[in-house]
Curated annotation (Swiss-Prot):
Located on the platform of the 30S subunit. This is Small ribosomal subunit protein uS11. Residues 1-11, 19-58 have a biased composition (Low complexity). One of its GO terms (molecular function) is structural constituent of ribosome. Residues 1-72, 178-198 are annotated as: Disordered. InterPro entries: Ribosomal_uS11, Ribosomal_uS11_archaeal, Ribosomal_uS11_CS, Ribosomal_uS11_sf. Keywords: Ribonucleoprotein, Ribosomal protein, RNA-binding, rRNA-binding.
Length: 198
């Protein structure tokens, strides 16, 4: 019995050495599906560490670059001059040197008293929107201006209607600034020493 035990002990000793030799060779492990699963699992933590580090997040937007990116956007500036007599909307490029479109409330109404109305400002804004869309603009900044100086520093009634119409036009709106000129010195009102005679 000692011989059979010794004989049985010899193959048992040989089998663990073969199993230990197989993982070292590496060729049989690559073919087995069990071995490929840990490799995929090892790759997943590496991929999971990249978003945490922030390296994969900047790579994701370039994949969607053909659709829309900030580089593809064409921005302009909508200058809104609003007084109690009229509303003028002047669309330019970012430099302000090239006029894209211009319209006023007085063009869209027949009576002088309606030139500064919200309806006229909305019509003027819609005309500017159509022209800007035809020229490929995707968004713009808005600069609102009242008379300023020695006149009114509050925009007229058409300013809000014009801004709302521009916002509903489907463009991306950046900044909205009030660029009303304010005097910082002794600017003299017109009318002379005795003032305006009524």
């Amino acid at each position: 019995m000692s011989g059979t035990e010794a004989g049985a002990g010899e193959p048992a000793a040989e089998e663990p050495t073969k199993e230990a030799a197989q993982p070292e060779a590496g060729a049989p492990d690559a073919g087995t599906p069990e071995a490929s699963a840990p490799e995929a699992g090892a790759a997943q933590p590496e991929a999971g560490t990249q978003p945490e580090a922030g390296t994969a997040q900047p790579e994701a937007p370039p994949e969607g670059t053909p659709e829309t990116t900030p580089a593809d956007e064409k921005l302009g500036i909508a200058h809104i001059y609003s007084s109690y007599n009229n509303t003028i909307i002047h669309m330019t490029d970012l430099t302000g040197a090239e006029t894209v479109s211009i319209s006023s409330g007085g063009v869209h109404v027949n009576a002088d008293r309606y030139e500064s109305s919200p309806f006229a400002a909305m019509k003027a804004a819609n005309k500017v929107i159509e022209s800007a869309r035809a020229k490929g603009f995707t968004g713009f900044h808005i600069r609102v201006r009242a008379v300023g100086g020695v006149g009114s520093r509050v925009p007229g009634p058409g300013a809000q209607a014009a801004i709302r119409a521009l916002a509903r036009g489907g463009f991306r709106i950046g900044r909205i600034d009030d660029v009303t000129p304010i005097p910082h010195d002794t600017t003299r009102k017109k009318g002379g020493k005795r003032g305006r005679r009524v």
